[in-house]
Amino acid sequence: MQGPLDAKHWTRPANYSRFFPRDEPPQKDAERRQYAREVLGKFATKAFRRPVDDRTLEKLVAMAEAIFTQPGHRFEQGIARALVAVLASPRFVFRVEASEPVAKPSVATHPFVDEYALASRLSYFLWSTMPDDELTRLAERGELRKNLASQVKRMRADARSEALTQNFVGQWLQVLDVEGFTVDVRTVLRQDGGSRQRVILDTELRRAMRRETEMLFGLIAQENRSLLELLDCDYTFVNAKLAAHYGIKGVSGKEMRKISLPKDSPRGGVLSHASILLVTSNPTRTSPVKRGQFILDNLLGTPAPPPPADIPALEEAKGDSKGRTPTVRELMALHRAKPLCSSCHSRMDPMGLALENFNALGMWREKESGQSIDASGTLLTGESFHDVRDLKRILKEKHALDFYRSVTEKLLTYALGRGLDYHDVDAVDQIVQRLEREEGRFSALLLGVIESAPFQKRREATTATVSAEPLRNSKLNVENRVNP
């Protein structure tokens, strides 16, 4: 049943004017048909993210006309049927990309994507949604590519740019997993010597953990700070609940805010964030292996290979003739003694063990199973450290280029919606060099990605020219767009 039953008293929905510029459709057939072209042309152009071609528009108008010309049917009912067809079209569901005309059709080349495709790439990268009217107007005039810097600045100032922070950071640093991660709070606290602090790992605390990491990245992006502050900095973001979790006093209220950290604080930088410490742990204890692998993979871009299938779990190596519960460091030493394990674990373990003062909930602790924690170690590259403070300093000072390369590869992958291959190596090198010249500023990374050949050009080489009617005769690249 669909009401109201009496069409004379049909009430327009609140968003009626967004689709129909007139209060009532024209009564004459020719004028109604032209009005249908106007309504559907505007909607299809927006949905397809480029001008709709005449052939497609005629089909949509005919589809609508077949409904609203029937007795007892309203004009809006016919338009609604055509709108459904637009939303079911591959041109809406997928990103359809055309190329700019090729200067020498006989020579294989990687042509630039046209300006409409560039507008979509830019918008989905920064906003995770379709281009707005300004981007579309610039693309229509062929002026977007030469105004990229100003448009990126405008888009970064828009509230929709928060999507880049949440989606990219959520995937890159795995903080999207925080709210669903399972952990046995009692068991974790018991390993720390029976902490009397009551911990309620509820949705509010988990959300604060995630927001701490997002807000650090967001501040670096907004104020064009150095990306190295992700590794170590003298501030963080907390509310009362997260501050209490960290043992930080003097913070009240539910709102997250920036606070300065003491000089000797182990906090500061993503390696001390509860969000990351939580998702790189096991449900009942810390995991130096997961934490070390996280640093190698996500921060340094040098992941260790997966372990052989026949290697036993760490818990199976437990046992002590004195009845004492071994520490995680001792268990790791036993595990590392196996020839098949030593090569990879010698890379991962020192970094992971440097974070052992943080339990599986991201809380600071001095002891594990009644024994003082030893967080010292030596990296495979030769640098020695005493604790997590030293490790963060070493990563920031000695491995900045590795970090620049890693974050460049991650962001370029996010921007393109695909994995990188050998064709992209030169572009990554150029962005890393730019970051080095500009002291790791966020703008160097963002503009470097947007101005890079992989972002600006088609992946497949072609010798074909592109028709002026891109949706009818062009050679098209249809790419499934999944929000990053």
Kindly label every feature range from the protein language model.
Residues 11-15, 52-58, 76-80, 94-100, ...:
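Short coil/turn segments at secondary-structure boundaries
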Residues 39-47, 60-64, 79-87, 119-123, ...:
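Short alpha-helical scaffolding segments that buttress acidic/His motifs in well-ordered protein cores
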Residues 140, 146-294, 304-305, 482:
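A cross-family structural signal marking well-folded subdomains
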Residues 1-25:
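Extended acidic/polar, glycine-enriched regions
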Residues 471-480:
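Short, basic, low-complexity termini and linkers enriched in Ser/Thr/Gly/Pro
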Residues 21-82, 90:
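A conserved hydrophobic secondary-structure block that centers on an alpha-helix together
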Residues 67, 243, 258-402, 415, ...:
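Sequence context surrounding c-type heme c attachment/ligation sites in exported
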Residues 55, 72-76, 95, 105-119, ...:
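Extended, well-ordered alpha-helical scaffold/bundle regions in very large, multi-domain proteins
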